[in-house]
């Protein structure tokens, strides 16, 4: 086996798989280090991909030729478009997945890269020299050299599981933690913190009374995540919905002192938007019930994931809770829920490229950066792996900004503001939601991926054909026009102003759909239905997109004003508070400075004026 690589990725979870694949796609000799290859692509918590905000990230990963979308399509057993009744900007694709099918598809994808090796073992230490990473050492003493290293340890970094009054070191149930790497981080001076997450008990679906719960089917037809998936062929299933009861709440209140979160056993912070059932009852005790989604974990696996009752209460209390929930009174618990604490690095230690500021060539992605969720991890993994490969090859690193995609929003939030709790993506975090839609991720990012060399031949050809078809369809819709009187004959009530309106103009009306304009102009029938959807969305948002484009241009102007080498003591007019905050955080651009707490518009104006003066000075002396 070779002992030297361009890029080494530590961890085979969602971040690690995307990082290794991204580095390999741009030609880097890559190694993926994981405890066991059999666990690569494992879904540690819920058996689902996507959702509100998260589905956008999956589509963006796919647009850059990442793996998650195609793997979820291969393993998905129920697909739903969340927020379907709302506007396209906030719709979120989501899929239930068969755990075995998902992991198998991911492992097959990883094995498909000829320049990607898998090394089984525990990464125990980082190696570095002269301020740059040089490789890693495994627990068995083996050493591997690399020009760049990506760390994606998930919950394994000094992981500690809590179940009732018991606790023990683990990275996941029945899997050992990663202990040594934290020592390397501390030796390098990284600021570490502790975070917590949890998971619910697993149930035997054969013992659930499905007649007592509401059944929820998926969408028909199912809409894939990836543009390269022509159709979903995996058999589809239904999920169940039930609720907690007042009896459930009484059991929890009587035993809440035995929860590690309330006994003082756990001191770290958990995800605000994925609270334990104990938290729900303590904080929202006035509710008469909390919804629970019963999600099958596989087509040939009886295990059911009860989404909504994450808990670390003692095992016997969990059984008592289940007996109070409709449909679960006689269910058998296959495995208790638990909480897990783990180390994370303050993400303000990172550049927007996800390279660390302290050690060149070292990149971090996923829960180690303080995020929660498979999709957040995958998006970071892709960016970190891509930049690790570029770094190893001596190329310029790439930054995805807040106007590029949700992955840019997330990374900017992390490296600019840091975190006080596990970070989860929501559509509300993005300023430019109208342009950053799940349906146009490929239109926004695939060309950028092509320029970076991370998009393969198949996607490149598909993208070229799609963009050509979209351009032709828009041109056709804009070339066909009608008067208000003519429109009235087709049942369309327009302002009788005598102005001709194109088919594209008509589609901008909220109440007019593609089928109606196609009935007027039969030639629109030749447009592929998938392309027609894009044309209609673009028309609906056209006026708003023009305004948002102006906002993005202003944002990009601020982002182009670099602050990397500024001596803030030499900037006249800055307040002491602003100067202190800027020195502490060292923002890269004026735009990033504006997103720091305590930096006023006046301070930004002073900075921008100072930079322009300095630029003029350099030009006059150059």
UniProtKB/Swiss-Prot annotation:
GO terms for MF: flavin adenine dinucleotide binding
Ligand binding (NAD(+)): 270-284
Keywords: Cytoplasm, FAD, Flavoprotein, NAD, tRNA processing
Glycoprotein recorded as keyword: no
Family annotation (NCBIfam families): mnmG_gidA
Role: NAD-binding protein involved in the addition of a carboxymethylaminomethyl (cmnm) group at the wobble position (U34) of certain tRNAs, forming tRNA-cmnm(5)s(2)U34.
Entries under PANTHER family matching the protein: GLUCOSE INHIBITED DIVISION PROTEIN A (PTHR11806), PROTEIN MTO1 HOMOLOG, MITOCHONDRIAL (PTHR11806:SF0)
Protein name: tRNA uridine 5-carboxymethylaminomethyl modification enzyme MnmG
Organism: Rhodopseudomonas palustris (strain ATCC BAA-98 / CGA009)
This protein's encoding gene: mnmG
């Amino acid at each position: 086996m070779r002992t030297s690589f361009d890029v080494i990725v530590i961890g085979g979870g969602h971040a690690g798989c995307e990082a290794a694949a991204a580095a390999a796609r741009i030609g880097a000799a890559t190694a993926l280090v994981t405890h066991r290859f059999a666990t690569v692509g494992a879904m540690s918590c819920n058996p689902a991909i996507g959702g509100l905000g998260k589905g956008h990230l999956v589509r963006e990963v796919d647009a850059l030729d990442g793996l998650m979308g195609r793997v979820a399509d291969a393993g998905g057993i129920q697909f739903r478009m969340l927020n379907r009744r709302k506007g396209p900007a906030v719709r979120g694709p989501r899929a239930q997945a068969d755990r075995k099918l998902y992991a198998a598809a991911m492992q097959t994808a990883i094995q498909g890269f000829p320049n990607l090796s898998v090394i089984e073992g525990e990464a125990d230490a980082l190696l570095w020299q002269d301020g740059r990473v040089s490789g890693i050492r495994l627990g068995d003493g083996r050493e591997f050299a690399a020009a760049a290293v990506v760390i994606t340890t998930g919950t394994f970094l000094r992981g500690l599981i809590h179940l009732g009054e018991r606790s023990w070191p683990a990275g996941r149930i029945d899997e050992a933690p990663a202990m040594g790497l934290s020592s390397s981080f501390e030796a390098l001076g990284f600021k570490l913190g502790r975070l917590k997450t949890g998971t619910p008990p697993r149930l035997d679906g054969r013992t659930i009374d499905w007649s007592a719960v509401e059944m929820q089917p998926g969408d028909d037809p199912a809409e894939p995540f990836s543009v390269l998936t022509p159709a979903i062929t995996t058999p589809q299933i239904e999920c169940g919905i039930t609720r907690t009861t007042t009896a459930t709440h009484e059991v929890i209140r009587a035993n809440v002192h035995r929860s590690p979160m309330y006994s003082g056993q756990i001191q770290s912070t958990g995800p605000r938007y994925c609270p334990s059932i104990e938290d729900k009852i303590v904080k929202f005790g006035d509710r008469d019930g909390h919804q629970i989604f019963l999600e099958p974990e596989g087509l040939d696996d009886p295990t059911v994931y009860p989404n909504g009752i994450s808990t670390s209460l003692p095992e016997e209390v969990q059984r008592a809770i289940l007996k109070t929930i409709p449909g679960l009174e006689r269910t058998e618990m296959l495995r208790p829920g638990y909480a897990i604490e783990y180390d994370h690095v303050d993400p303000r230690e990172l550049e927007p490229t996800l390279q660390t500021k302290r050690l060149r060539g070292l990149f971090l992605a996923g829960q180690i950066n303080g995020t929660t969720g498979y999709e957040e991890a995958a998006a970071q993994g892709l960016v970190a792996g891509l930049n690790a490969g570029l770094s190893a090859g001596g190329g310029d690193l790439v930054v995805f900004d807040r106007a590029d995609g949700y992955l840019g929003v997330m990374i900017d939030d992390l490296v600019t503001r840091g975190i006080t709790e596990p970070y989860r993506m929501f559509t509300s975090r993005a300023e430019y939601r109208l342009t950053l839609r799940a349906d146009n991720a490929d239109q926004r990012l695939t060309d950028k991926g092509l320029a970076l060399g991370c998009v393969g031949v198949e996607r490149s050809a598909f993208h070229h054909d799609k963009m050509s078809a979209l351009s032709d369809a828009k041109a056709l819709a804009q070339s066909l026009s009608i008067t208000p009187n003519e429109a009235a004959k087709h049942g369309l009530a327009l302002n009788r102003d005598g102005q001709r309106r194109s088919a594209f103009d008509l589609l901008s009306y909220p109440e007019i759909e593609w089928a109606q304009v196609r009935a007027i102009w039969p030639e629109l029938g030749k447009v592929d239905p998938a392309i027609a959807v894009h044309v209609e969305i673009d028309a609906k948002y056209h006026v708003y997109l023009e305004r948002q484009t102006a906002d993005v241009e202003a944002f990009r102007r601020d982002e182009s004003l670099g602050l990397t080498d500024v001596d803030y003591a030499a900037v006249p007019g800055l307040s002491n508070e602003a100067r202190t905050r800027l020195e502490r955080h060292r923002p890269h651009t004026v735009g990033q400075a504006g997103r720091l707490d305590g930096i006023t518009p006046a301070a930004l104006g002073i900075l921008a004026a100072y930079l322009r003066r300095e630029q003029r000075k350099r030009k006059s002396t150059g």
